[in-house]
Amino acid sequence: DVARETELQFASELSNRLGNQVLLKREDNQPVFSFKLRGAYNKMAHLSPEALKRGVIAASAGNHAQGVALSASKMKCKAVIVMPITTPSVKIDAVKARGGSWVEVILHGESYSDAFKHAEFLEKKRGLTFVHPFDDPDVIAGQGTIAQEIFQQYQEPIDAVFVAIGGGGLISGIGEYVKAVSPKTKVIGVQASDSDAMNRSLKANKRIEMKDVGLFSDGTAVKLVGKETFRICKKVRSEEHTSELQSRLHLVCRL
């Protein structure tokens, strides 16, 4: 398989500071340094041979793009990755390196939204399969394998699982698995206060699109959460927490 089982690491300093046992799921040790590989690969692994032969397309400026690129290379499937023209060259080079000759990178638009719309256009024009970064059942299920590993690696009762939220794919996948095997375990979403589209949507009981989002955590800076992820989050999340930029910087410095 492309994605690997990652370590569940005991965080001694955090545990001592908080007076609780804190474990970290080290998804930064994936080949693309992110959990995004799980969802991208799972989506592509469920495509028919005919669909794989036609190829896939994705829009991303970061980790999802690398996940699709590496999966395409391993599965020998052509992939088109649409990235904003503002994407740093190091990220573009990383996608090309992961995918090699199997990947075509197209730079389009000033923002992720522009790149996404162009990818949707090319999907129809070329007959490709769109690999959504979060709002897709197979992508969500792929991210959910993280929770499966956690419960296999740790045999004691788990009080709560804290999950970062962007578009909602990660918390949806983890939340569905957790609630199926351990209903008493809390699933707590964590968002930046300046990009908390899911938090606002859940409070309003409808999807809320933000005009602007903060970019300190650019991987979770999503203006509008997915339809499917919103539906699932309403069922599985226990609560949400938002953090200010100053608090996030302070925590990073202490870690």
Q: Where do the PLM segments sit?
A:
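PLP-dependent amino-acid enzyme catalytic core
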Residues: 1-243, 247-248
